[in-house]
Amino acid sequence: MNIEKIIKDLKLTFYQAGELSIQLRKKGLDKKIKSDNTPVSNGDIEVNKIVTKKIKELTPDIPIVSEETSDNKSNLNLNTFWLVDPIDGTYDYINNLEEFTINAGLIVNKEPAAGIIYAPVKKRLFYSYGTNDAFEDINGSPTKLDSTKNFDKNQIKFVSYSNKLKPEIENLHKKLNVKTFTKMKSSLKFCVIAAGEYDGYVAEPRACEWDIAAGHAILVHAGGSVKDFENNKILYGKKDFKNPSLILKSKSLL
């Protein structure tokens, strides 16, 4: 399996899916609340169709687990599979905010082997397919991600899911000498850490594997790390696809 070629062949599809997501939002989205009490729109569904169709063309024998496909979330004892989140940050998407992303991560032997993330409004595309092979497309050209480039040990900057930190998160920030943090809700947080714009992120158990798989690959391939609070590896294909606690670090903090 040529993972580099697969990811590069997905890039155009992600640009197209991003443009569709914006056009559908301009027309006015059809929105509803799912059984898990989270929002979904026709934009999520249409982007999912485009992305999963292309992935099936490129890797017909690899299963796809998508947030927006309800019939594929039973425990299939998966080792090698795709995790797709067609719109991560649906709240931002349906409320005309900018940080939502389109995501696909390839899992091989329960670990992230490749990832691709596109933030359509910000027009930022990130992807990776192996160690030291993590990139952002800038002006149409792949630019290698460097998570160390803006590091200042006296001004450690984190991203956070919320402006108000829970006590456990606040304590971890203190241990890591975090000076400032910025709210960021989508998988874009993995990308900005991989790009050296921020230094890390801490989260209690929340969300699901499709929310983090692509970003996990990109950050690790850029030299960073993704572990739980006990410093264990994050593995994929768990029975309920739920995430454990997370600590994301740029290479500078390792």
Where in the sequence are the language-model features?
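Conserved beta-strand termini and adjacent loop/short-helix elements that scaffold enzyme active sites
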Residues: 67, 183-184, 229
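Glycine-rich active-site/cofactor-binding loop and its immediate structural neighborhood
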Residues: 80-121
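Residue-level signal for inorganic ion chemistry
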Residues: 21, 44, 55, 90, ...
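Acidic beta-strand-loop-alpha-helix segment within the catalytic core
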Residues: 104-191, 234-235, 239-254
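Conserved beta-strand segments of alpha/beta enzyme cores
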Residues: 63, 177-180, 225
